[in-house]
Amino acid sequence: MGQKVHPLGFRVGITKKHQSQWFARFQKYAYSQSVFEDHMLRTTLVNLFSNLEKESALATKQSKNRGATQPKAPKITQIKIERGLIPYEIGIQIHSNDCLSITKAIDNIKVSKDLVTNLQKTRKYLFKAGTQLKNASMQVSDNLNVAEGENSTMLKTKTSASGTSVLKKRTFKIQTQKPTKGKFVFKGKRKQKKKLSKAVFMRLKNIKRRFKKRQTIKKRYLNIISKGLLIRKKGNLIIRNVKIKRKNKTARLTSRKSQPTLRSGSNLRDNLAPVKSKMQRFNNRMSKKFANLFLTKLNKQFLVRLKAIMKFWHNQNVTKAPLGYNKKWSLAKSYALINNLKAKYLAKDILSLGSLRVQKLRKLISILEKKSLVKMETLRKDFITFGTLSKTRAFGYYQMITFLKQLKELVTKIKKQTIANVTTKQELCCYNKLALNKTKIQNLIRAKSKQTKSITQKVVNNFVKLVDDNQAMANESRKIKWISYLKDLVNKHRTENIFYYLATIATARKDLNALKRYTKQHANFLFGVNVENAKENPNALLQRVTKTLTQYSKNPLVNNDFENAEGLTKLQTAFLTQIESQRKMYKANLALTPKISIKFFSVKTTNLLEKASTVADSIVDALEKRKAFRGVIKKAKEDLMLRSRVTRVKGVKIQVAGRLNGAEIARSEWVRAGRVPLQTLRANIDYAYRTANTIYGIIGVKVWIFKGYSKI
């Protein structure tokens, strides 16, 4: 039914090593030691509660005889152990129907000290015996090695004298040749070649083959280069370049044997044609270059002249309109356009009017820019053709540009006005909101101060009640006793299995040293003391530190003005609390003492009967009383399904395995009712496993209860 998981955190049932994966970071978070510790805690708690149940059963038997009312025995549905990443904190949750009666189990705790001492003695004895055995075995092995070494040296000396020893690598045996008639004959005169392994031999063979291949390729390319043939590949095309040495194509005299003859490489006209084409190309290219250079120089001159004319018209006060003056581009025109816009959109809001103005003016600006560019192009062409600029046309261009500039300035002004209006409105809104928020915050502060006062009063009242009420005091003392007992138990367990906790002790030491360094570095902020200056007067430093610590340790319930007494700020107190808590934690880790918290959760009777653990326990009780297994299983199933109308039980599966009804061959039987989807992840399934100890052996009981789908 799904993948099995080992309690230490890795997958089980996989034979291949590469497929097994760890489900937890084993070394980092100390997963193994926590699992081992949790198992120990759970077993101790179960034993405690089982003793309590036995006592309650005896009490019920006695009450039956007397004819008194039968008290209900307390049942534990679940024992949950919670942990953080640090092994310092352990949270234990106990879910049961009667929490008060379960707390009485602590009164029955009896620790046998003799048993612990005997165990320690036996452990020491076994450890000593083991070490002695190891030492003895080591001595024997050393003696054997020495004897073997001496034998080998003796044999070597003998063979060197005779010269007949041949060592074999694999068998490690020494063979000696027998002497024949007083003459020594050496068997191995020739040096035997070292036999290579198959893999090495194949590798060397491949290397030789590749080397030969490279040499052949090199030779082939050298031949091709010597002939003047080279092949190139461009995509799918293969191009062959033929390089031939140039011969003198002009007519020259050649002598065959003795008669001189005039010989030409080819026809003279054919030879001169490509030369002419090359000359034409060169001339065209040069003329283009010259034209480009000339145009760039002219353009530069045009820009210089145009700038000079623009400056002339800008600096000169134009009293009379010169030639080329146009009424279209006058300054009054722009203001008239804006006045018309105002008259049109007076009925609308200021924001909408501003946006409409800006849109219209932007369109106008874009059109004017295009026209100005066209005019500039005409001026440039005239300058290239005639070599000068006409003043009338230049003045028209200047008028257009100035009009454009003023229009752009006007648009920016309108934008600024609209933004200013919007910001003022927003500021007013924000101011009103802030005023409202201030009042709300003040009310909240008052309410919080009242709450804190009421909480402090409640705490004080609770303490007073505890002192007065004897039962409450007894419960509190019982809880403290329980926690101290569990602390001692965990401490013993950790000291016995200290090899699991060496890493945690080392980290705790490192953290403590780091905390000390931090406090020294920030001593000025925390205690108002310079460590370097205080080395001369250590008594003053001690007094100052003790003052601040005593002031910090004052109870806020008694002293409300403890922060302002010696200038201790809230930040300082927060830092001091944090440092103190960390220091305590690291010291506890070094001493291997945990911080244990116990919480009891009461479970309703209806919910208790739905739990898989209670159903499994009831089946175990029935089987141990020698009842027929089929009847027990069916009854449990039917009871659960009858309650399904009221409760949220939607399916049940019960499995029993072992020597059922005392049968010789063990088998497994199961019963199911409703739906029990064991493969779906969303399914909320309550599972429990118990073992029934019968006369015929152990019977395993498994219960699955399906309680609907959970939201992921």
From Swiss-Prot:
Chain intervals for the UniProt region annotation (S3-like 2nd part): 581-712
Region (Intervening sequence (IVS)): 119-580
Result for mutant: residue 436 to S: In strain: CC-503
CDD domains hit by this protein: KH-II_30S_S3 (cd02412)
Keywords: Chloroplast, Plastid, Ribonucleoprotein, Ribosomal protein
Signal peptide bounds: none
GO biological process per UniProt: translation
Localization, UniProt: Plastid, Chloroplast
Chain residue ranges for the region called S3-like 1st part: 1-118
One Pfam family matching this protein: Ribosomal_S3_C
Example of a GO MF term: structural constituent of ribosome
Major localization class: plastid
This protein's GO CC annotations: chloroplast; cytosolic small ribosomal subunit
InterPro entries linked: KH_sf_prok-type (IPR009019), Ribosomal_S3_C_sf (IPR036419), Ribosomal_uS3_bac-typ (IPR005704), Ribosomal_uS3_C (IPR001351), Ribosomal_uS3_CS (IPR018280)
Subunit: Part of the 30S ribosomal subunit.
Family: Belongs to the universal ribosomal protein uS3 family.
Additional record remark: The large insertion sequence is present in the protein as found in ribosomes.
Protein name: Small ribosomal subunit protein uS3c
